[in-house]
Amino acid sequence: MDVFPSTTPDEAVRKSAKRTAELFGSEYLLVTPSVADGSIGLSYRKKAEYSDVKELPPALAEKQAKAAAAGRAKRPKIQPQTKPQADGSGASMSLVKRAAGPAAGGVGGEGQPKSLIQRPSATRQQRPDWHPPWKLMRVISGHLGWVRSLAVEPNNEWFASGAGDRTIKIWNLATGALRLTLTGHISTVRGLAVSPRHPYLFSCGEDKMVKCWDLETNKVIRHYHGHLSGVYTLALHPRLDLLVTGGRDGVARVWDMRTRSNIHVLSGHKGTVADLKCQEADPQIITGSLDATVRLWDLAAGKTMGVLTHHKKGVRNLAIHPREFTFASASTGSIKQWKCPEGDFMQNFEGHNAVINSLAVNEDNVLFSGGDNGSMCFWDWKTGYKFQSIDTMAQPGSLDAEAGIMSATFDRTGLRLITGEADKTIKVWKPDDEATPESHPVTWAPTLGRQRY
């Protein structure tokens, strides 16, 4: 009599299900390979949509074959190189393969590539030059509004300032004494420029007016009409009798200085043209706009040469180096340096977290940036090193919120910095004559790499 092992109903059901899975699961639980990898759909699309281009035309196929053959002919043969080991136990089984020929190790060791032990030259950083710190020299009062524009005369005898009180004032640069006040604008004066070849002073303002003042008679002799809104900036071409203006209507206009005719209308910006600069070589006009772009213009054709879109916020100011073929642009919390004429990016000036309203650079490679909160930073132009950071002081009787830098420029020698501020004063700064590299050392240490963007 056969004896069957006693099992519970649950165990019997579990064994039956397990046996069923062993018998049939291997066949029915697997996904068809063609369905899993989608080969059915791909083969259908190849046949239905790409059957006409399955084979290249004979001319194109022959051209590609020649190009592939030429590439194989130019490629050097790579052969594994082995050498006897030091203990004489046969050839080394090193996995390093080198091109046929003498080893490129140099004096650093036989067969040892120098690139593995030396830092690439691209990451080596130049040590910044020493610059003396700057200190306050003079405070000039007289305006009744924010000082929004400054311009220094070519002979370095006087400078002009334009402010929110709708006046233009001429000041003695050596003494700070007021020499003249020009009235004529009916709104804030936003831009000033002194001609190096004529006794002319040009001004623009939020009243849509662009005026030419004769400094021999102290009267307006020309008006330039065409802007549809406030004019925020202007610049003179260094060699040609051309005036360039830009404003809230988003265009830059090129004027013939003498005939008042509008030569070009440089349109392309989608926001206010906050600043523009002119230079002799291409690009002869550079504009910065609140649409966060910088545009380089071909003056002869009146067209855009390039657009720089690296900034994330509106570009409020530009500065061109007086000797080098480079310039800088400033937006909120960001200053970038560019190389002309294509506008190749060079470096960032990092560390000024403010709305930067003013930029200026002198021949000694000192870059100044002024913020709307009164912060002032001085940089080494070559390396982007910030060697001084100070805060301006609002004049007594002003609010702390009025300690803002609205405009700035160096004089012709580069030894005086003039700033126009929101406390209605003009401040003149100079380098500290008593500072030495020992008393104010350069606290700089190289980093492994430079952040480009």
From Swiss-Prot:
SMART domains: WD40
GO CC terms of this entry: catalytic step 2 spliceosome; cytoplasm; Prp19 complex
Composition bias type Low complexity, residue spans: 62-71
GO biological process, one term: mRNA splicing, via spliceosome
Entry-linked InterPro entries: G-protein_beta_WD-40_rep (IPR020472), Prp46/PLRG1-like (IPR045241), WD40/YVTN_repeat-like_dom_sf (IPR015943), WD40_repeat_CS (IPR019775), WD40_repeat_dom_sf (IPR036322), WD40_rpt (IPR001680)
Residue ranges of WD repeats: 142-181, 184-223, 226-265, 268-309, 311-350, 351-389, 400-439
Quaternary organization: Associated with the spliceosome.
UniProt function note: Involved in pre-mRNA splicing and required for cell cycle progression at G2/M.
Protein known as: Pre-mRNA-splicing factor prp46
Organism: Aspergillus fumigatus (strain ATCC MYA-4609 / CBS 101355 / FGSC A1100 / Af293)
Encoding gene (name): prp46
